[in-house]
Amino acid sequence: MRTERDKMLAGELYDALDPALVRDRDRARDLCQILNATRESDRELRRQIYLQLFGKGGETVWMQPPFFCDYGSNIELGERVFFNFNCVVLDVCPVKIGDYTLFGPAVQILTPMHPLEAGLRRKQEYAKPIEIGSDVWVGGGALILPGVRIGSKAVIGAGSVVTRDVPDGVFAAGNPCRVIREITETDHADVK
C-alpha cells in the first residue's frame, strides 16, 4: 500500500497531517530552530546540521540563517549553493538546485499546492517539484512557485514571482516573471 509520503512525492493528493509526515516536519523544523540559533562562529555545528537536514549536498552549502524548510530531505543541493537571510524552501516535492546557485534574502521556493475546491482543501494538498539549474542568481524577495524549472546561468530579478519555466542564460523579472533579455558577453564588461 502506498504511503502518504509516496503520494506526496509523486505530486498526488495526500494527507499532510499523516503522523509520519508530521514527525518528519518536526525533525526538520527542530534542526532549523537549532541552526537559526547558532552564532556566526559556529561553522562546524552549522555544517553538521546541514548534513542532517538536507537530502543531498549539505557538505558545501553556505547560508546566513534564519532558514526554514518543511522536510529538508527533499532538497538536493549542488556544490556551493548560497542562501542569504530568511530563505524558505517548502520541499513537499523534490527541490533540486544546481552548483554555485545564489539566493538573495527572503527568497521563497514553494512546492505545495492546494485544491481550488474547498472540500478537498480541508484535508488534502499536493505539490509539484522545482528544479533550479547551476550558476543561477535569484534576487532577494523572489517567489518560485510549484512546478517551475529555472535554467542554468539565469538571473531572476528581486521581487519576481516565477510562475513558469525560465530558460538558460536569461535575465527574467517581474510579477509574473518574464524573460527580459538574454545574458551576453557584454554583461561581463560592466564588472571591473
Model-predicted segments: where are they?
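Short glycine-rich donor-binding/catalytic loop of glycosyltransferases
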Residues: 159-160, 165-167, 177, 183-184
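Terminal amphipathic alpha-helical/low-complexity segments used for targeting or macromolecular assembly
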Residues: 1-60, 177-192
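Flexible, glycine/small-residue-enriched loop-and-beta-strand segment within the central core
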Residues: 67-77, 82-149, 175-192
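Short alpha-helix at the nucleotide-sugar/activated-sugar donor binding site of glycosyltransferases
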Residues: 102, 154-155
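Extended beta-solenoid/beta-helix repeat architectures
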Residues: 148-151, 166
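Short arginine-rich
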Residues: 34-36, 164-169
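Short-chain dehydrogenase/reductase
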Residues: 62, 137, 155, 171-173
